[in-house]
């Protein structure tokens, strides 16, 4: 396919957001800032329609990968700007477009009246555009550029309310931790260019497949895979680099919803999907990915069960579910990882937006479980949507989460080993923390019964209707399993799937089996453990209602352990202090004394030399003749030797 043959909907994916941002920035912001959201919402509608049109093309076997123009060439290396529209990309793109657009609508109501309304929408849509670019990149250099743009936009959004010190610190922490991962991605990119001489995905896949067939894999391939996993752990908040994400809740609720459901944190998982042919050929890397994912999923679920702030509970929930996606990848289930990424986008967006509505009811950016309770009647629509999303997250049949999450846990059970038992803990923990949040927020004692003043009310329609439509996806997205299987199987753009070794690397033969659980499975391990989680949460929040504060009072050390993430956050802060102290030492000793001393000493030496030489310039002709004679004598003596 030539650039002239690219479908118009592919061009509009970029043209509409860019036009909306430029029009909003140059025309509306100086004149009518309160109208900035109008062209952006129109852009969202166009992007959503185009995303589904492209997904339909791929579903019917018309995927494409085309270089649009060459924008950099250095020696033998050349990098093109291209479009890759294939199965994994369009599956995620469709969810990002739909969920992201509805979050934009929600944001129009949520941010109304904020002094930074115009600035928020421009950066928010840039965030949206960056993720579209990341999903449609056809080479590593292009993906890296959009990867960085996603990070910059998230920094601006997390620190949007920069008048708050906590927001500034959270934005800086998120940015700095992601820089650690981004550095790994950059080094991996340099190794890729050095070893493969190209950045294009397909050309790299083919080289890996041929090298594997001939037992001539590059020696640096394990290092490249490890660096890419490191980058994904930072962006997708996996242990040990997960700790930035809970603090990133300082931004407005729409930021949290878009970041957790449809953009930034899913980028790391998608990077591994794109890079799996490079990773899977090293035997010890997939088990490493699975181990990181399983451990993070259990670890974050335990922490989530102890938090009080609604958005922090959901933040640790996101960390846990990203771990489930990493677990699926490590077990070779690319289709399941993509499918759960899509389903997670629906139910996590609903949960965050419902948390925003709860905070809106008490006129706060977020809410604490101690300040709410018994609000199912005061907020009926929010409660209904939250309940649907909670059941989906827990993996209860027939909600969407069952078809994705429980399918992954079923594969993990069959895998055996410690991951088998981790899958049970994940199923139990997910149901426990989300049902605890449900019961403490919408059931139990109302705030006035606790001696607090609160007059909750349902949010305006613009804050409820988008949540309702996303909740439909959380309920019924499980029906997409066959379609996503087909996209993943037939949508690897331009790949000759019959090439020996390549199909095995991608694990394509197993992908159509995603989410095909039997009813017996539904009532078995996954739903059984989820039911136990619900029952335990109900007993500890509704029957023994004082348990949640009683264990904190009786076990302050245990509470401190949970608060510090079992000491990991304390260790990270200690390490950060040591690094900062080292930087200050370098600035004080190396920079001020040694480096400045070297520079000043060089200047003093040059000045002294010039003064010495200046002394010989007496201005008398006899002195100059003497120096000329001496120089001539030296030259003659050297010539006669």
Regions from the PLM with identified roles:
Residues 2-15, 34-38, 78-95, 133-146, ...:
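Membrane-entry segments of alpha-helical transmembrane domains in multi-pass membrane proteins
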